[in-house]
Regions:
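Tandem repeat scaffolds
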Residues: 3-193
Length: 193
């Protein structure tokens, strides 16, 4: 279902919690600063939407389309985005602590400066994404495709990178203290075992 901006504002401002917007077409919507905490947005189309500074903590965005969406400085703590499309999404300075981004398609997304502490990114395709200066401490990146991803100055301490593909990734200045890289393909193509 497609909503006009006015209808969307009325729904958000109704105070109803949680909001049920499963399968909704919110493509291109301006949701800057909106409180969508605990919202149900399964399979919703949020492509090219402005979600900067929005609160999506504890929301369910399973299989949602967030391609090209602006989520800069958004709050996504413990948000479920499993299987979502985040290709080209902007998540700079976003808070994604303990979020579930497993099995997402997240090519060329920008997570620079984002807080992903304890997040689950297992089995995701994060090729060519930017994680520079991001906090990925204790994150699960097992079996993840990280081809040509940028982790410069990122904190990957205590992260799980088992069986991930880091071919061509930039790890310059990254903190890898206690990181599990067993059976991972390292940037130079060697396998860590």
């Amino acid at each position: 279902m497609q909503y006009t901006q006015q209808e969307l504002n009325q729904i958000i401002n109704s105070g109803q919690k949680p909001l049920w917007l499963n399968n909704a077409d919110l493509s291109g919507a301006d949701l800057h600063g909106a409180d969508l905490s605990k919202a149900r947005l399964l399979r919703a189309n949020l492509s090219q939407a402005n979600l900067s500074e929005a609160n999506l903590s504890w929301a369910d965005l399973t299989y949602a389309n967030l391609s090209g969406a602006d989520l800069s400085s958004a709050k996504l703590k413990a948000t479920t985005m499993s299987g979502a499309n985040l290709n080209g999404a902007i998540l700079t300075q976003a808070i994604l602590e303990e979020a579930d981004l497993s099995r997402t398609t997240t090519i060329k997304a920008d997570f620079s400066g984002a807080n992903l502490r304890g997040a689950n990114l297992s089995e995701a395709n994060l090729s060519e994404s930017n994680f520079s200066h991001a906090n990925l401490r204790e994150a699960n990146l097992s079996e993840t495709t990280l081809d040509s991803a940028n982790f410069s100055q990122a904190d990957l301490s205590q992260a799980n990178l088992r069986e991930s593909d880091l071919t061509g990734a930039n790890l310059e200045g990254a903190n890898l203290d206690g990181t599990d890289t067993e059976f991972a393909v390292m940037p130079d193509g060697t396998i860590d075992n």
